[in-house]
């Protein structure tokens, strides 16, 4: 290990005797040495042995610490040198008490060497020979003999329990003196650690105290340094204050007011002039500051505008990137839709053909059954008129059709009995049952078409087939660049882009079924509504806003499909189909109609199709035959049953037509329902019937179908012109029934007249037949 450079120390002249004393060695090996008391070095300069100096050094708190360290470190360094040379020999010597003191003294000085950082190697070399004397061979031999003689005595107990420092030292000792090693039987096996001597314990305690004292001394040194610094600062501040006070006293003496001096009289004009001059200067300064402030404000504004220009110029690259990505996206979307539109049209055609085939099957079957049954009854009537004894033969086809008709009617009666519907009238049922084999084929074909529907966009990413994702793209465009968005008329393009995607979702949609999904519950409808609700356009762009997107989609996609259902698939005689169709049409035509000033061609086409289809149903499907009274008086005769069924079937169509109240105009409904159906077919059948409770019941059903909206005007005394024939029939029936005992039926007829606002006719009838008790019915109305 490298030695520190040599250091020089100043020593007092009085310490020379101490250094001389340090060179002295004990006169005799066995002479006892007195252990120094810890803390004695506090009062004395370093003198005597280095051991006393080392023990007393840490206990000094005040006094000349520097010189104490010099002596202690020099002594330690001096005594450390011979111990390093002698090595293990000095550590393994087993001598008498005096030699043990010397060896112990040497070990303590070696331990104290680590406590001082100021030792000098040069000084230790000078004092090496004077402080420690190495015992010679004669001295060692004499000590060994003395120890052996002491061991030979029986009552001798050795107090030397000091352990050898190391195994290597013992080996070297045995090698140096093999004769001194005891025999095997004289060796003692150490089972525990040998106890320390009193001197060793005292030395260890002194070392620990020295370490603690050294730490305390370092803290005391820091505390002393800090106190001195604070005192120097305080003295310096006090001196400065004294200097200031002295200067202040001197200046006060100089500036002392002398009352003997006289001043010229005060002139107010001069003071005023000075104040005005000062005010002018301040105003000019203020104006200059204002000019500078305005200049700074202009600079700030120009800086802000420059920043905005720079930011906008830096965003041009991002804007270009966005427009480019949007252009690529729209092109890819159009290419995808153009590729899929052919497949979509094929699937739509397949589904439409399947439903059309089913509808035509029902219609053709109804017409064929009506034709065969009517022919059979006519033949039966001719037979009854010509002869009563001849045999009547029916061809096999007619017989099979009649049996099939009766079989289906029987099943429907049983179903109504099970459901508890006992008020059903024959002829009002929808004869739309299919044989099981045909139903299985229909369901299989429909399932195959729906599987093809699912595979249309199976391999396409959601960004190009999901309506919500597509609208989100355009919504981002609208939020980032609204000007370019509205300039591109995107609200007019979106319905065309979404048309194929919506048509795919409408393949399984059948508005003629009551269980069909409503438009508001469809995914595309909700997505479009969310897109419209998120619109942030201002009032200036309201005319071209995205709020018309849904109406445009309905006009371009939904209404044309609905028109196809009305023209080719809708059966006006079916109440369930009519009710479901009206529900969807109300949503389309009322809640999402276009602007009042704008005429929708698709909407007009739909309404025309509805009216045209109902006219066709009135002309083709309504057939009420007229038979002789002798044939229909018997309610169980086939003629009477057939006539009843056909009347109720016509009344069912009458009711279905008037369900369009609110969607079709009143003139259209009155012309179609009252003019062509009621007056042309139903009234004739009623006139051919015998007056009685059945006729009154039928009249009640006719009046119940009429919309209340037509009779809301309380000032009406006469009904609408199209009901004139019906009113005359009611009065005629009332005249006939009043002559008999059907007074309750007469009262019901009066109520019907009051309901349809034929009040004048009702009052005339009551006055003519002196039915004063029925006048209250008119007054209550």
Swiss-Prot record:
Subunit structure, as described in the record: Found in the Intron Large (IL) complex, a post-mRNA release spliceosomal complex containing the excised intron, U2, U5 and U6 snRNPs, and splicing factors. Interacts with TFIP11 and DHX15.
Compositional bias annotation for Low complexity: 114-123
Family the UniProt entry places it in: Belongs to the GCF family.
Tissue expression summary: Widely expressed in tissues and cell lines.
UniProt GO BP: mRNA splicing, via spliceosome; spliceosomal complex assembly
Intracellular or extracellular location(s): Nucleus, Nucleoplasm; Nucleus, Nucleolus
Bias-annotated ranges (Basic residues): 1-10, 59-68
Entry keywords, A to Z: Coiled coil, mRNA processing, mRNA splicing, Nucleus, Phosphoprotein
Annotated Gene Ontology cellular component terms: cytosol; nucleolus; nucleoplasm; nucleus; U2-type post-mRNA release spliceosomal complex
Chief site of localization: nucleus
GO molecular function, one term: DNA binding
PANTHER family: GC-RICH SEQUENCE DNA-BINDING FACTOR, INTRON LARGE COMPLEX COMPONENT GCFC2
Pfam families linked: GCFC
Identification of the protein by name: Intron Large complex component GCFC2
Residues annotated with Phosphothreonine modification: 97, 213
Function: Involved in pre-mRNA splicing through regulating spliceosome C complex formation. May play a role during late-stage splicing events and turnover of excised introns.
UniProt modified residues of type Phosphoserine: 16-17, 19, 40, 96, 129, 174, 180, 214, 217
Compositional bias annotation for Basic and acidic residues: 82-92, 101-113, 201-212
Residue segments, region Disordered: 1-228
Compositional bias of kind Acidic residues: 17-26, 213-222
InterPro entries: GCFC2-like (IPR012890), GCFC_dom (IPR022783)
Entry coiled-coil feature ranges: 267-312
